[in-house]
């Protein structure tokens, strides 16, 4: 194509260049072969040639006003190959808009949008000859010329002018660079180049300058020629060096070249040359030292700074513009000076606005030294000049070049610098300074730089509105139509904006470098500066990338023209397909329009919906804001309230601390500040109560004194005998009445007497210090006529302190008595021995025993031949007629907590009938339950002080009850502590309590360990059966059918039995051990026994003696068999042990060389008053519900006299009900520490609590089952090493125990023992059956039997497993039974009998049966399975005849076998026995041979069971409501002749034989000559022994046998022998083993059986099994009875002894 021969515009050149670059990138190496690329190359070369020629033409012409500043490139050029050259921007194109007037002060921005022609660059020749410097002009006309910045050409460095914008790349039209091999390098240079503001184009010369142009035109041309010659010379000089002045080193230049070449290779997908790889790898291996580079750069910048300041003046220039109404005048003579001043005027760095000054006379310049204008100078208006980015880069380049410039250039620059303009001053100041020849020109342009200014004269008066409008005075206010204001130069504004950005960047770079080089900056500051510096260095690259992206965007958005190759092909013709396609496109277009409309409609609906939603959300937001504000408001008030509460709590804590520290003064002061009305009320109440108590103390002292005085007057002794008793005058009481600040304690203990030593007649030993203090306290009470409570902890010697008091009164006070000491039966022998040991001088009578024994002692008491009487609680009531007649000086009650019930018979008897001057209570547990019980003790000893239980209880429990509120107000901690403190104040004078840890430092420690025992497989199965089904399941040996044992209403009690030993249930023992022989099964079936099998031999080997406490006597029976089996000697003490026998047992066990290792005791019987300190190990076999019972038991060994450390082992079955019992026991112990409880505290639990307990046990069992199924291991068994650590006291014992373990392990390995406990595989098959499936099958069978009627709904009854303290006390308030008492109580009337009917709550009301003298005292004790327990007497029974009765004792529970329900009863004809009830009733209750109850020791031995272990007797359960059921025991045993089947003659013969046998038994005497049959002649009296008929099913006696003989009722002599056997078996069931009746029955049966064999002539073994199963030697069933309160622990002993009853 031909190139048009015309001048190309800037836009055309830019468009051609972009297309040329696109083709080069698209075709790569093939670009030169593309025609379009060739054509564009020629066009660009032609345009470059045109611009070069134009520029040369302008330089040759030297026309003023058309010169342009040649701005060197500020960026250092990299060293290029030989053909490379620097780029210089061409001059601005003259083809600008013809009507555009450009001032010399205006900069023309060559941005991408304007596309100026100056963006094209032309290559310079090798010597840089084209780089011409502008000529200096000295003519006046230069005022309107563009300012030139001189560019030194030192060292021949090639500089170039660059446009301002970097968005488009500069053109490089050098032919050498159009080659492919140099193309990538040229692109890199273009992208990295910074585009600076371009040259400024001058406007046409003003008219004033043309007048003088001719004068200096020749001079100007001459100067331009000289400058060109100097430049060419300098270029030739630098050509020899060829080392451009650059900031890069040779290595850096080489690295840059390698990087650029590598980049080109990567872009073109070519391999990188090896030499470039080596250079790059070297730079990686040796990274540059950035600190050194920064230091070098800083030094470079510092050296550059002076040159920049010198060259700054060349950047500013001013053009004279003709202002309206102003004419510029120039003086020809001063043209040069003015021209120099204008051209070289420096630009102030702080002020961007300059005023053009027009000189007015010859003295236009005042002084060049101070830079001020002459007086005759004239101000010329001009436009402000803004320092742009191009100027800044120009300064940097000039500075770089000026470093090597000759000194002559610096001197020349300094000489041509004009004086700096000064800031404007007020006009009057300027006139004063230049008084002559000054001419002032008014300037209204605020942008002009002026010399002076005037302030407008503002009038302070009112301004008329008309003056603001146009009028003749103010012509300038007139608006002239058609005259437009001067427009805004947008190009200049853009240039200024870009210049400011460049300045800010440059300033930021300098600041970063300063921070990096400043060592004083912190590390973080320098690090941030380094980051900023790197970011700013990336700015050129970012601009280049942006330009590259924009060029492609422009190309993509441009329309294709014919210049593209796509249009070079031939245009094809239109056919039908095109029409169809067009039609289809049209339809698609219409469809799109329709869719667009639909879319717009949907969008409009969505917009409306969105608008509605937004409106709704705004309303919700407003609402939420209001709510949040309300919440914040509430939160604010809450915080304020919390802060106030914190302040109150802080004050309360301070008061509490003061109260705990006993700082009463500080507490009162803090309380006054708080003004707490509740505590103030409490204090007032406390003070009032203490005042009343103080007066009551005085009343009590007067009362005691009056009693003593009356006693003295009535007594026959002389008054001198009591002369030693301190007497208190009445005046002493009256004097203190007026003193309101009397100390409460000092009033009680007014008279003080120090005691230094014990009485001389106290000879048993030496009292300890704390015992001396106790004696002194008791003597102080005696001196002040007061009574008290000695409440020392168990084991601190209360007995000895009491004896010391009596001996002190006897010796020091000369008071010979009489003294009454009331003690429990179990401790009577201990008291007697202590008196004999410590006070033999005192004449002591132990008033107890049979009536005959007491009669002998009654005479001594009546005669007064005694000093001290020891008796029990029972004889206080029974022998009231005798003992109440004596006027006792001192009454001492041991175990005084039995006086808790103020309405008991004992308390009423003592208060009403007994006279005692002084009273003293001994107790180790004064506070067990609640405050009324404590009040009962205080009321007994101090009746005048504590006379109202109501006021006392209200005072401590509900102090705010009378403050007007109806709800119960709980006490806070502070109030509770305050109440406790005042309680201590009340009790301190009258109650003395010391703990062993406080006073007895030498007493060895007591260490308690809870030992967990695993269950055997049998225990686990039984436990789950009882827990889930409330019954146990055994196998019927006859039909191999599973049979369930019923009647276990008290489920928790049965669970405790299972945990202790499964053989408590005889049916289970028959399944596991049918022979009843003692073997390893006795300890393998129970985890506790297995543990004892390991522990007891170790204790025996190490010489430690053991006390084992039990709750159930049945377990004690099994324990006896176990101890005999492992060959350990033992002693046993339970409720059946008599008082005399107890003393003997204690003596045997405490003997120095005692052979007994173990002492097994019942917790209730053996836990009081026993001194067993020779034992140092205590084993609590099963935990009591009342923890104080266990504490009492522990202190049997841990007491004064103990030399060894006491180890307490509490056996607890793992995962059982025993863990719950232990937890509750610990909770009950908290009351001792707290003293006060919120509300009443008792030991009763409701049925809901019982059900909750069972539910918790079921849930726990279910959790354990899940764990077992999931494979989680249960708790491991206690290891032998752990047991040894518990038992061993030292290392030697540890070695012995370890050796024993090893020996036992070897023995078990030899025997092949795999598990010590019984495993499931060793159990009978019945225990492997699925009980649930069996029960479902039985239910289906029973439903079929009843034909769908279903069974009767069983009413659920819940039973408490707790017993109140009152019920527990019953066992303690009775002495031992009397065998020889003959007097009987009156029988109850029929009305009283009727009163025993069951009430609506399932409780039987009635009066307990008691015997005054002769008969036994029978009391219904609320406990289950108490077979061998003491009789407990309830004193409350004497108050009312309709009080709640306890449960009858002695019989086992009624147990039904499931298999016996459908069995047929025996025929009436086959039974020789008839009774009051119908035969069907009698026999329907007789189960099959396997029984569920227990047999006694006697029965077991008689039936040859193989082990002489007795079974405890229990009690039955009642229905709970309705009429009492018929009695199923106590039936008449009658043999009628009508039932006899033998002929009459045979019966007559049998009657003769039976009569001989009867007379033999009737007249038989033992070796002592005593007839044994007396007690068996008739049945016991129902009035005296009602429980006999409740226990024995068929009572029978010798009278019945005689009647049967007389009526010929016997078919054979064996039936007579069976009746004798029934008599003796009944006696052994009712009476205890070892009693007289028991032994007589054995002896009589033996001789009667022998006589029978002689008569019959047959010595074969007799079998009474079938007879025993039917007629009474089997466990019988009690009538259903429900008591008011159920025993808490349901233990098997009640600590009472039974009197042998005649049968």
Curated annotation (Swiss-Prot):
A motif (DEGH box) lies at residues 894-897. This is Transcription regulatory protein SNF2. Residues 588-661 form the HSA domain. It is found in: Nucleus. There is a cross-link at residue 543 (Glycyl lysine isopeptide (Lys-Gly) (interchain with G-Cter in ubiquitin)). The gene is SNF2. Residues 779-944 form the Helicase ATP-binding domain. Residues 1542-1655 form the Bromo domain. The keyword Transcription applies. Its main location: nucleus. ATP binds at residues 792-799.
């Amino acid at each position: 194509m031909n190139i048009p021969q015309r001048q190309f515009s800037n836009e055309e050149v830019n468009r051609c260049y972009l297309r040329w670059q696109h083709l080069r990138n698209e075709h790569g190496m093939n670009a030169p072969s593309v025609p379009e690329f060739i054509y564009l190359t020629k066009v660009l070369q032609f345009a470059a040639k045109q611009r070069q020629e134009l520029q040369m033409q302008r330089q040759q012409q030297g026309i003023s006003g058309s010169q342009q500043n040649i701005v060197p490139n500020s960026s250092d050029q990299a060293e290029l190959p030989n053909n490379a050259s620097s780029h210089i921007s061409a001059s601005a194109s003259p083809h600008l808009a013809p009507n555009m007037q450009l001032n010399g002060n205006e900069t023309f921005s060559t941005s991408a949008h304007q596309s100026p022609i100056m963006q094209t660059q032309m290559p310079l020749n090798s010597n840089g000859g084209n780089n011409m410097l502008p000529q200096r002009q000295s003519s006046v006309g230069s005022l309107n010329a563009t300012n030139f910045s001189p560019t030194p050409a030192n060292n021949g460095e090639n500089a170039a002018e660059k446009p301002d914008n970097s968005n488009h790349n500069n053109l490089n039209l050098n032919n050498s660079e159009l080659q492919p091999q140099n193309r990538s390098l040229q692109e890199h240079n273009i992208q990295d180049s910074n585009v600076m503001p371009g040259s400024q184009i001058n406007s046409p010369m003003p008219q004033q300058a043309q007048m003088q142009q001719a004068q200096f035109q020749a001079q100007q041309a001459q100067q331009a020629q000289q400058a060109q010659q100097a430049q060419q010379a300098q270029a030739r000089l630098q050509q020899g060096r060829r080392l451009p002045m650059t900031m890069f080193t040779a290595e850096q230049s080489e690295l840059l070249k390698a990087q650029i070449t590598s980049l080109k290779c990567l872009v073109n997908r070519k391999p990188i040359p090896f030499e470039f790889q080596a250079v790059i790898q070297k730079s990686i291996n040796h990274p540059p030292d950035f600190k050194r580079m920064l230091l070098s750069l800083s030094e470079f910048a510092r050296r550059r700074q002076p040159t920049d300041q010198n060259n700054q003046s060349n950047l500013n220039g001013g053009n004279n513009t003709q202002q309206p109404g102003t004419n510029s005048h120039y003086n020809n003579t001063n043209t040069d000076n003015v021209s120099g001043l204008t051209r070289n005027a420096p630009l102030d760095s702080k002020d961007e606005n300059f005023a053009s000054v027009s000189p007015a006379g010859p003295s236009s310049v005042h002084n060049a030294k101070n830079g001020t204008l002459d007086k005759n100078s004239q101000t010329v208006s001009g436009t402000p000049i803004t320092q742009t980015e191009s100027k800044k880069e120009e300064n940097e380049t000039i500075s770089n070049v000026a470093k090597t410039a000759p000194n002559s250039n610096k001197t020349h620059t300094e000489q041509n610098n004009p004086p700096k303009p000064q800031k404007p001053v007020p006009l009057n100041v300027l006139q004063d300074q230049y008084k002559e020849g000054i001419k002032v020109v008014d300037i209204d342009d605020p942008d002009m730089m002026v010399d002076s200014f005037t302030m407008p004269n503002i009038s302070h008066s009112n301004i008329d509105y008309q003056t603001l409008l146009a009028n003749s005075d103010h012509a300038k206010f007139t608006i002239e139509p058609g005259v437009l204001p001067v427009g805004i130069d947008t190009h200049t504004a853009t240039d200024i904006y870009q210049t400011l950005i460049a300045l800010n960047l440059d300033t930021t770079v300098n600041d970063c470098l300063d921070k990096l080089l400043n060592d004083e900056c912190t590390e973080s500051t320098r690090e941030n500066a380094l980051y900023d510096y790197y970011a700013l260095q990336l700015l050129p690259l970012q601009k280049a990338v942006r330009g590259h992206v924009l060029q492609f965007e422009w190309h993509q958005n441009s329309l294709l023209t014919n210049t593209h190759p796509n249009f070079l092909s031939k245009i094809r013709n239109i056919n039908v397909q095109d029409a169809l396609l067009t039609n289809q496109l049209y339809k698609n277009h219409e469809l799109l329009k329709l869719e667009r409309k639909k879319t717009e409609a949907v969008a409009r609906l969505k917009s409306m919906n969105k608008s509605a939603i937004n409106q709704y959300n705004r309303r919700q937001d407003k609402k939420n804001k209001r709510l949040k504000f309300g919440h914040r408001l509430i939160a604010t008030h809450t915080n304020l309230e919390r802060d106030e509460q914190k302040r109150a709590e802080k004050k309360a804590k301070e008061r509490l601390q003061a109260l705990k520290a006993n700082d009463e003064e500080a507490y009162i002061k803090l309380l006054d500040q708080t003004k707490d009305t509740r505590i103030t009320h409490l204090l007032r109440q406390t003070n009032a109560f203490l005042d009343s108590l103080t007066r009551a103390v005085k009343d009590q002292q007067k009362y005691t004194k009056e009693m003593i005085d009356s006693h003295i007057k009535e007594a026959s002794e002389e008054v001198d005998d009591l002369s030693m008793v301190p007497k208190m005058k009445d005046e002493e009481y009256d004097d203190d009445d007026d003193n309101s600040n009397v100390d409460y304690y000092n009033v009680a203990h007014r008279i003080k007497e120090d005691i230094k030593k014990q009485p001389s007649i106290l000879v048993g030993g030496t009292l300890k210090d704390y015992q001396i203090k106790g004696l002194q306290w008791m003597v102080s009470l005696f001196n002040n006529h007061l009574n008290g409570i000695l409440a020392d902890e168990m084991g601190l010697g209360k007995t000895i302190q009491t004896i010391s008091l009596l001996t002190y009164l006897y010796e020091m006070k000369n008071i010979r008595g009489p003294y009454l000491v009331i003690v429990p039966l179990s401790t009577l022998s201990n008291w007697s021995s202590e008196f004999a040991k410590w006070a033999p001088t005192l004449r002591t009578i132990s008033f107890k025993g049979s009536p005959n024994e007491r009669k002998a002692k009654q005479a001594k008491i009546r005669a007064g031949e005694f000093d001290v009487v020891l008796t029990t609680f029972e004889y206080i009531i029974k022998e009231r007629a005798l003992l109440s007649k004596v006027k006792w000086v001192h009454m001492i009650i041991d175990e005084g907590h039995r006086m808790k019930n103020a309405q008991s018979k004992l308390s009423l008897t003592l208060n009403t009938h007994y006279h005692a001057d002084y009273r003293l209570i001994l107790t180790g547990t004064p506070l067990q339950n609640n405050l009324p019980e404590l009040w009962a003790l205080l009321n007994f000893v101090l009746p005048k002080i504590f006379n109202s239980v109501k006021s006392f209880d209200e005072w401590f429990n509900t102090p705010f009850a009378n403050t007007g509120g109806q709800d119960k107000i709980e006490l806070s901690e502070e109030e509770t502590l305050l109440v406790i403190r005042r309680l201590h104040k009340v009790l301190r004078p009258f109650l003395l309590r010391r703990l062993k840890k406080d006073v007895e430092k030498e007493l060895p420690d007591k260490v308690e360990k809870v030992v967990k025992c695993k269950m055997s497989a049998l225990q686990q199965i039984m436990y789950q059966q009882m827990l889930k089904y409330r019954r146990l399941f055994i196998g019927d040996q006859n039909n191999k059918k599973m049979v369930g044992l019923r009647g276990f209403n008290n489920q928790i009690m049965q669970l405790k039995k299972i945990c202790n030993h499964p053989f408590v249930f005889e049916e289970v023992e028959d399944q596991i051990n049918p022979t009843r022989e003692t073997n390893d099964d006795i300890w393998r079936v129970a985890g506790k026994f297995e543990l004892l099998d390991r522990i007891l031999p170790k204790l025996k080997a190490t010489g430690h003696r053991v006390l084992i406490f039990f709750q159930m006597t049945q377990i004690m029976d099994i324990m006896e068999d176990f101890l005999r089996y492992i060959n350990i000697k033992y002693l046993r003490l339970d409720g059946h042990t008599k008082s005399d026998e107890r003393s003997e047992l204690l003596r045997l066990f405490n003997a120095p060389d005692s052979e007994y290792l173990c002492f097994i005791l019942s917790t209730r019987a053996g836990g009081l008053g026993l001194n067993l300190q020779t034992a140092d190990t205590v084993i609590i076999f099963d935990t009591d519900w009342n923890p104080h019972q266990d504490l009492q038991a522990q202190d049997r060994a841990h007491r004064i006299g103990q030399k060894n450390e006491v180890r307490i082992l509490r056996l607890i079955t793992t995962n059982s009900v025993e863990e719950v019992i232990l937890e509750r026991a610990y909770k009950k112990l908290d009351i001792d520490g707290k003293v006060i409880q919120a509300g009443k505290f008792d030991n009763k639990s409701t049925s809901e609590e019982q059900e909750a307990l069972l539910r918790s046990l079921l849930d726990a069992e279910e959790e354990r089952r899940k764990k077992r199924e999931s494979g989680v291991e249960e708790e491991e068994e206690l290891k032998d090493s752990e047991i040894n650590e518990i038992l061993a006291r030292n290392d030697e014992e540890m070695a012995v125990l370890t050796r024993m373990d090893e020996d036992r392990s070897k023995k078990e390995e030899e025997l092949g023992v795999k598990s010590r406990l019984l495993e499931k595989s060793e159990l009978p098959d019945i225990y492997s059956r699925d009980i649930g499936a069996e029960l479902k099958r039985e239910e289906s069978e029973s439903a079929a039997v009843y034909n769908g009627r279903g069974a009767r709904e069983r009413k659920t009854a819940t039973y408490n497993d707790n017993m109140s303290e009152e019920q527990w006390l019953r066992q303690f308030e009775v002495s031992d039974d009397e065998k020889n008492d003959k007097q009987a109580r009156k029988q109850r009337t029929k009305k009283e009998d009727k009163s025993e009917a069951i009430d609506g709550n399932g409780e039987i009301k009635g009066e307990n049966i008691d015997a005054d003298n002769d008969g036994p005292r029978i009391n219904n004790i609320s406990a289950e399975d108490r077979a061998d327990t003491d009789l407990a007497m309830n004193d409350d029974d004497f108050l009312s005849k309709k009080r709640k009765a306890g449960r009858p004792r002695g019989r086992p529970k009624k147990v039904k076998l499931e298999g016996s329900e459908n069995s047929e009863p025996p025929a009436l004809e086959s039974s020789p026995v008839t009774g009051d009830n119908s035969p069907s009733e009698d026999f329907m209750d007789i189960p099959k041979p396997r029984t569920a109850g227990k047999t006694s020791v006697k029965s077991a031995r008689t039936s040859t069971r193989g082990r002489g272990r007795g079974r405890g007797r229990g009690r039955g359960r009642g229905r709970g409501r309705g009429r009492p059921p018929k009695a199923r025991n106590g039936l008449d045993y009658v043999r009628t002749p009508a039932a006899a089947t033998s002929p009459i003659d045979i019966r007559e013969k049998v009657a003769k034989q039976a009569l001989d046998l009867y007379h033999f038994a009737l007249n038989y005497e033992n070796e002592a000559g005593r007839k044994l049959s007396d007690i068996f002649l008739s049945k016991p009296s129902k009035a005296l022994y009602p429980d006999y008929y409740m226990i024995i099913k068929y009572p029978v006696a010798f009278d019945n046998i005689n009647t049967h003989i007389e009526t010929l009722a016997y078919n054979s002599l064996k039936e007579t022998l069976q009746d004798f056997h029934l008599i003796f078996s009944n006696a052994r069931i009712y009476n205890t083993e070892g009693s007289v009746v028991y032994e007589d029955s054995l002896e009589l049966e033996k001789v009667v059986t022998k006589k029978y064999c002689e008569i019959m002539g047959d010595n074969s073994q007799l079998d009474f099994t079938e007879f025993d199963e039917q007629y009474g030697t089997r466990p019988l069933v009690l009538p259903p009875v429900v008591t008011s309160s159920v025993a808490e622990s349901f233990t098997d002993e009640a600590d009472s002894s039974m009197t042998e009853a005649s049968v």
